[in-house]
Each structure stands twice: as C-alpha cells, then as structure tokens.
C-alpha cells in the first residue's frame, strides 16, 4: 500500500530515525454503510482493525531496527502499535483546570510528545514556559514548537534556554519516564508565586509531580518556570531552592 511504500522511501532516502503517520490516532471511526463492505451496516470498528493490521505489517516488515513510529493524538486503541503519541488535543482556558488523566492511566504503557498546541506567534508571554513545565512533569517529550519563534530577540532566546534546560534534564530521566507510572501532580509550598498564565488562567510558577519508576522507586520532579529563584517546601517537608528556569529530581 501507499503508506508502506512511503515508510520504505522515507527511511531509505531521507535516513530518518522514525516515521510520523498523521491522523491515525486522532481520526474518529465514522460509521460506514457501504453495502459491499464485509461488516454490519453502520459499523466503525473496521477502522481500528484495518489500521492495526497495517501498522503491524509496517512494524514487522518495513520499520528499520531501532526506528520509532508515532502518530497524531492519543486514541487508546492504538497504544500497542505506536511508540510515541503526539498529544496536542488538551483543551484549556482560564475557566477550566486540566486534569492529567491520560498520564495517570497510560504513562507506563506509552510515551507522549507535548500535550497541547504551542503558541503560534509569540513564546514570551508565559504560556510557552508553562506548557513545557507541564510537559516535563507529565513525562512528555519536549520540543513541540515552531523554531522560528525562538532566538528572535533576547526574550525569546531566554525561552529557548528554558526549553534546552528541560530537554537536557529530561534525557537523563529515561529510567523513570520509560515504563514508569505518573502518580500525581503537586504544588510546592513556600515562595511560589501564583500568576495569570495566558490562555491557561491562574497557576503557580513552581510545580511538581510524583512518579514511580519501573523498579518501584518513588521520584519527585520539580520545575521552576520563573526567571527568579524560589525556596519551596516539598510534600515530604524537605525545603529546596529552585534556580531560575530549572528542573530538579528528588529520589525518595
């Protein structure tokens, strides 16, 4: 099929380390009433079965060793056939609170990238830093951003530095984020400013999450998205100082 031919061509001719296949984990399984199709009229499960069979074929006979394949969004039924899911469909507004239900349930079964759309025109208003802080705490891959918005000026270069800090920190957390379980989010007490984040509403500059590694170790992650240092208190009672635009791991 066309998808399998493209998979071969992209890996062979472009030398990529993986494949991104749009829409599969995002497309709704609309009912089909075609009389010549071998399923009950109005059935929709054929979408899943057909995509699953195609992806199993791709992984078995077309995906190069060591390469990954990921798709758009995060329909649960496709977790077994993709390595990474691009989760950018999280709705948010100042009038609602995001509940990290997906990582709570599936963090030990799949890897995610991002969790909502990145700013389209300006990364210096606060929402970009807030999003990347949340991404790290959820265990998601970072970097879902238009690079043309970074390094435009000193302000945007600072945002790029924050992203780089978190990215370099995250690459050392594979022992937890790969196969580990996201347990909860928490807000450290103490010197922790509460601010208005554009398109998100009020939230804290320093936030944290608790994980359990695949071998059962409890780990806390804390991120300071502010340009100032803050001394905060963890749920364990321990006091720590978070440097500007930084992340920290605490093994319990």
Describe each region flagged by the PLM.
Residues 21-29, 71:
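Conserved beta-strand positions
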Residues 4-7, 47-242, 246:
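Active-site-proximal substrate-binding groove within the catalytic cores of carbohydrate-active enzymes
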Residues 1, 27-52:
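Aromatic- and acidic-residue-enriched carbohydrate-binding clefts of CAZyme catalytic domains
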Residues 19-20, 30-31, 230-233:
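Extended hydrophobic-aromatic, low-complexity segments
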Residues 1-23:
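An active-site-proximal structural segment forming one wall of the substrate-binding cleft
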């Amino acid at each position: 099929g066309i998808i399998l031919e493209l998979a071969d061509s992209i890996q062979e001719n472009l030398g990529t380390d993986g494949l991104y296949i749009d829409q599969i984990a995002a497309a709704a399984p609309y009912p089909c009433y075609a009389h010549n199709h071998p399923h009950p009229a109005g059935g929709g499960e054929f979408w899943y079965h057909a995509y699953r069979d195609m992806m199993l074929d791709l992984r078995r006979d077309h995906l190069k060793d060591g390469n990954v394949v990921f798709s758009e969004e995060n329909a649960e039924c496709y977790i077994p056939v993709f390595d990474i899911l691009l989760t950018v469909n999280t709705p948010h507004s100042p009038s609602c609170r995001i509940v990290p239900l997906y990582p709570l349930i599936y963090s030990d079964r799949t890897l995610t990238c991002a969790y909502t759309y990145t700013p389209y025109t300006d990364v210096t208003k606060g929402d970009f830093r807030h999003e990347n802080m949340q991404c790290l705490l959820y265990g998601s891959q970072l970097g879902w951003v238009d690079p043309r918005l970074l390094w435009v000026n000193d302000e945007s270069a600072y945002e790029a530095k924050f992203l780089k800090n978190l990215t370099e920190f995250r690459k050392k957390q594979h022992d937890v984020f790969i196969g580990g379980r996201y347990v909860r989010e928490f807000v450290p007490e103490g010197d922790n400013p509460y601010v208005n984040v554009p398109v998100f509403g009020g939230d804290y500059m320093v936030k944290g999450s608790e994980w359990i590694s695949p071998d059962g170790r409890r780990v806390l992650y804390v991120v300071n998205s502010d340009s100032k240092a803050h001394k905060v208190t963890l749920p364990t009672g321990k006091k720590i100082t978070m440097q500007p635009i930084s992340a920290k791991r605490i093994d319990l």
